[in-house]
Amino acid sequence: MEPATEIEGNSNPGSSRPRMFGSTVGSGCLSWQWVTQRLSRARTYWIVTTRSAGQTHSRPVWGVWLDGTLYFGTGSLAAQNLTARPAITAHLESGSEVVILEGVAELVSDRAVVERMVSLYNEKYHWNLDPKQLPGPFYAVRPKKAFGWSFEESEVTPESTAFGNATRWRFR
């Protein structure tokens, strides 16, 4: 499958409040721009795939957020898992500026997209990858749902609204 470079409705997806068990949720939502800024500047992304027997497999990957899509490369067990079960969760490393994407990973087969990803990888990670000799395939994650929240860890108390700006976005 070839990924689209734009996700319909991705520039301004609908937002709502998620259920946050055991915490107080305030009234303000985060903007989608807040999410895209963090995804764009992240160096490492964590992905969670599912093995054939149903166990989850979590690992860090390097990637690029571009045009509403998370692109990453992997030649590991994650690639095998995605071949059989393309459902994926991806998130950033921070526990205080949380961004979580849920969606489907698609193998990137369009040569022009692969070459663009290699160019962006080389720039971002100071590599010298050759698009004809990649260690593994590239995937594109199309979010179906996203979550985000932020807080200052030093300000969290049992009475605080630690997840006061928790927001959920849904995509068409």
Q: Where do the model's predicted regions map?
A:
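Charged, gly/pro-rich active-site loop segments
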Residues: 1-29, 97-172
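Short, basic/aromatic recognition patches
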Residues: 19-46
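Intrinsic disorder/low-complexity segments enriched in polar/charged and small flexible residues
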Residues: 34-36, 48, 64-67, 129, ...
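A generic alpha-helix structural signal
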Residues: 36-39, 83, 117-122
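Short secondary-structure boundary/capping segments
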Residues: 36-37, 62, 80, 91, ...
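Short beta-strand segments
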Residues: 42-75, 82, 86-93, 100-102
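Alpha-helix N-cap/helix-start capping motif
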Residues: 75-76, 111
